[in-house]
């Protein structure tokens, strides 16, 4: 019932016992009848339909706003987890810096996020420049408003560094787990 609900709360894999207890106590204080804590990567894997309970390896890469969490799961639990501070906000910063350095155009976070969502890509298109969009900003030379066209290929170039950081984290995770699980994933 709504007056005494059972609650399932996702927690980061790095949460300490003290943090988990605080989360549980907060839910109890809010009136929960029963509280279940589940590691975020396990919840994500279940939501993605991965075989988390089986004796096979699965990998979840959760790119959030501030951190990216990489986790390997098997037999219903987390075998290895790590996080890196390369995520959505770093993507936005990389786009802003790219526009400033390559096009002498100042844009804000909202514009960078829109670019990321509309034409963002971790890799360049196979052929050509891919999709494009018009972007408005302030010309850093004249100080006047300016509109230019930016391609998917250019955004992939802008995102190369934070994407490479995430890929390195994935590779390190694969090196840390048993070879049998790596073989399941790759």
Regions found by a protein language model. Give the residues of each.
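Nucleotide/phosphate-binding catalytic cleft detector across ATP-hydrolyzing
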Residues: 1-63, 71-186
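Conserved Rossmann-like nucleotide-cofactor binding loop
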Residues: 66
């Amino acid at each position: 019932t709504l007056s005494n609900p059972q609650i399932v709360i996702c927690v980061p894999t790095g949460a300490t016992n003290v943090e988990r207890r605080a989360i549980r106590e907060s839910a109890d204080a809010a009136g929960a009848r029963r509280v279940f804590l589940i590691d975020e990567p396990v919840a994500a894997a279940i939501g993605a339909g991965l075989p988390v309970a089986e004796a096979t390896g699965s990998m979840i890469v959760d790119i959030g706003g501030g951190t990216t969490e990489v986790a390997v799961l098997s037999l219903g639990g987390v075998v290895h987890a790590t996080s890196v501070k390369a995520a959505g906000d770093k993507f936005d910063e990389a786009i802003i810096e790219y526009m400033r350095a390559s096009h002498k155009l100042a844009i804000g976070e909202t514009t960078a996020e829109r670019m990321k969502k509309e034409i963002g890509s971790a890799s360049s298109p196979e052929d050509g420049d891919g999709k494009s969009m018009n972007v408005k900003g302030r010309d850093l030379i004249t100080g006047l408003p300016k509109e230019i066209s930016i391609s998917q290929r250019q955004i992939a170039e802008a995102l190369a560094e934070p994407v490479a950081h995430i890929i390195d984290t994935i590779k390190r995770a694969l090196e840390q787990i048993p070879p049998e699980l790596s073989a399941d994933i790759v």
